Amino acid sequence: MYKRQEKDWGKDDFTKIPNGCAGIENMYPYMLSAANEGKITFNKAVELCSYNPAKIFGCDAKGAIEVGKDADIVIYDPTKDFTITNDKMHSDCDHTIWEGIKVKGYPEATYSRGKLVFKDGEFLGERGWGKFIKRSSSGNL
């Protein structure tokens, strides 16, 4: 993720422009909104946002609710209307390219390894809660 001033680094030399844009925080709301609209299935949204990334990056304890895997889960309200605005973002980025976009459905709570870390728009995680995840060698879908 980048702040606007960091994008200015490349104004005289495009090779200095940081790649990408901020937005990972909005991935689930967008995908779940698409599922609400019937554009994709809810199972496909989970596959694209959880299962496939875990497989691609070799994170064997992630991506599915199964015995022996980390207890990571998002509780989702499919009826909640939400407008994406920068002031509702939790990252250090100073803008969102999706400012003002309305989505149907929004995460209500998130559990990481069985511990509540997000509820009703508020991040509750503690510093140091994250842990290094050693990748497996597979990384295949």
Where would I find each of the regions flagged by the language model?
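His/Asp/Glu-enriched, well-ordered alpha-helical/loop segment
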Residues: 3-79
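Generic detector of leucine side chains in alpha-helical contexts
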Residues: 32, 48, 113-116, 124, ...
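C-terminal cap of metal-dependent C-N hydrolases
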Residues: 8-19, 70-131
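Short, positively charged
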Residues: 41-44, 85-91, 139-140
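Short, solvent-exposed cationic patches
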Residues: 132-141
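Generic alpha-helical secondary structure signal
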Residues: 32-34, 46, 102, 115, ...
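Hydrophobic aliphatic residue packing
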Residues: 1-2, 117
